[in-house]
Design a protein with these regions (language model features):
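Classical Sec-dependent N-terminal signal peptides that target proteins to the secretory pathway
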Residues: 1-20, 30
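Extracytoplasmic "Venus flytrap"
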Residues: 28-46, 65
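Signal peptide-proximal N-terminal region
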Residues: 45-66
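Short beta->alpha junction loops
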Residues: 63-73, 77, 127-128, 176-184
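Short, well-structured alpha-helical segments in soluble
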Residues: 71-87, 139-140, 189-198, 202, ...
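Extracytoplasmic ligand/sensor domains, especially the bilobed periplasmic-binding protein
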Residues: 88-152, 156-171
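Glycine-rich, charge-decorated loop segments at or immediately adjacent to ligand/cofactor-binding or catalytic sites
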Residues: 120-124, 185-189, 273-285
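Extracellular/periplasmic periplasmic-binding protein-like sensory domains
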Residues: 171, 194-219, 234, 238, ...
Length: 319
């Protein structure tokens, strides 16, 4: 959170506004303080209060206003900030609430969204976006000398954001596939991508060939072949899956079913915030993904819990 305030100070200097020691710096906060996302809004405010204590600057005053996770309410609150003479605002949290903020041109908004498509000129995205993550993945591919990478992108509302990140990072890849997250369709799609049917048939054909051969060791050869699921390799050495949670697990499980294992192919995904449920799935390991510093995350979580007696949502870390 200290980094966030550093950005604000840079923005303050860039606007050529002079502050004396007695001048109070007013910073607005747009967060969902009511409605179904109110608990997240509360966590964001608590995180900002912790940051203020850490930076020990009594000249900063925070003014929170409710967005109710609604674009119209967000605009009304932003216009109230404008009347107060506030020019810098943390928030809003969600991309949908940025819709009308180009009408408040006197304010710079440091939004917590990780989406960067079609942002208004007065909005800065401070979330962990796809471009920054893909740049990190690109370095990993280069240092690991991984040559043939495929992208698996779900047909969801952020697929254009991912494709923009791929273009900006100039990451080299072999092929790119979109897939339907519907479990009844997913496995068939992964089978096609991995040529599972051909590789499975290759195995059956080889078993049949050996059975009909005069090889004196054919029983042993057949025994070894029957331990396999497929015969023949896939045309890639790494998979980047731009998915999360249960949907991500379903994709990796489908890859395992088609005899593509993390033990012989690199399975790479986006930041999973150290998802414990994912880490506990031993058959899905190893998985590679970019992340924030684990030690810093643990320190933030412990500090937050000690002060407020509950664990924070990781989105509040960005504030």
């Amino acid at each position: 959170f200290k980094i966030l305030f550093s950005i604000f100070f840079v923005l303050l200097f860039e606007t050529s506004v002079s502050y004396s020691e007695e001048t109070k710096i007013k910073i607005g906060v747009l967060a969902p303080l009511s409605g179904e996302d109110a608990s997240l809004g509360k966590q964001i405010l608590n995180s900002i209060r912790m940051a203020l204590i850490d930076i020990k600057d009594n000249n900063i005053e925070i003014y929170p206003k409710d967005t109710r996770s609604d674009p119209d309410m967000t605009l009304r609150s932003a216009l109230e900030f404008e009347k107060m003479g506030i020019s810098l605002v943390i928030g809003p949290v969600f991309h949908k609430n940025l819709l009308f903020l180009d009408k408040v041109k006197s304010i710079t908004f440091l939004s917590l969204t990780n989406k960067t498509l079609d942002l208004h000129k007065n909005i800065i995205s401070s979330g962990i976006n796809s471009s920054s993550q893909l740049n990190t993945i690109k370095k990993f591919l280069e240092t690991s000398e991984i040559k043939k990478t495929i992208f698996l992108i779900p047909n969801l509302n952020y697929d254009l954001e991912i494709k923009k990140g791929i273009k900006e990072s100039k990451i080299k890849f072999f092929k790119q596939y979109n897939y339907d997250i519907d479990p009844t369709k997913l496995t068939k799609q992964i089978e096609k991508i991995t040529n599972y049917g051909i590789r499975k048939q290759n195995l059956l054909d080889e078993i049949s060939r050996v059975e009909n051969s005069d090889d004196p060791n054919k029983e042993k050869i057949i025994e070894n072949l029957e331990k396999k699921y497929t015969l023949g390799n896939v045309k890639f050495d790494s998979v980047i899956i731009t998915d999360f949670d249960e949907s991500l697990k379903s994709v990796i499980t489908s890859l395992l079913y088609t005899d593509v294992s993390p033990k012989n192919k690199y399975i790479i995904t986006l930041n999973q915030w150290f998802d414990e449920s994912l880490l506990k799935e031993q058959n899905l390991q190893p998985i590679y993904y970019p992340s924030i510093n684990k030690q810093n995350l643990d320190e933030f979580t412990n500090k937050f819990f000690k002060k407020f007696n509950y664990k924070p949502n990781y989105l509040s870390l960005l504030s």
